[in-house]
Amino acid sequence: MVIALKRFSFLASIATLTVLNACATISLSDKSGEFYINNIPSSAELHRINYDLTFSLGFTNRIQTKKKNEVNFVAFYGTGLLIDWKEGNQYQPFRVYLATNVHVAAGLKNEADYLPYSQPDAELGWTVDFRLGKYTNVKDFVSPNENRIT
């Protein structure tokens, strides 16, 4: 009897969560295909929050080759999500906290990092450039037909 009640309560909780799940109850706009490709969401649209908090991350690593006078550079790109920020002072204007995927973060190499994280890697080198970007010009992504380009 106790096992039957536990099973019933488990199934009831799963059913309740399924019904109350926000992803299942929010309807997206009819123009979802066009929205994802060609539009920046307006402030009234559901996905504007995601757009405002998402940034393009780019960084370049300098790799010393076995030849003394030869240096290679490798570029990495990924997506970052702003999770917090901190107002700074006269020496440090502000600080941002970005979340990203492990495969993106693994490429960031800084010699001044905490020792376990600053081990040299012959394939990645050291990061010499970091870029934070945001696309705001929708016309760059509109299909040629909409731009009347033939």
UniProtKB/Swiss-Prot annotation:
Whether Membrane counts among this entry's keywords is yes
Could you tell me the superkingdom of the organism this chain comes from?
Bacteria
Predominant location category: membrane
Residues carrying the lipid (N-palmitoyl cysteine) are C23
Localization annotation: Cell membrane
Lipid linkage positions (S-diacylglycerol cysteine):
C23
Q: Which UniProt keywords apply?
A: Cell membrane, Lipoprotein, Membrane, Palmitate, Signal
Instruction: State the signal peptide span.
Output: 1-22
Which InterPro entries has this protein been placed in? Mycoplasma_peptidase_DUF31, Uncharacterised_MG067
* Protein family (similarity comment): Belongs to the MG067/MG068/MG395 family.
Annotated protein name in UniProt: Uncharacterized lipoprotein MPN_587
> Lineage of this protein's species?
Bacteria, Bacillati, Mycoplasmatota, Mycoplasmoidales, Mycoplasmoidaceae
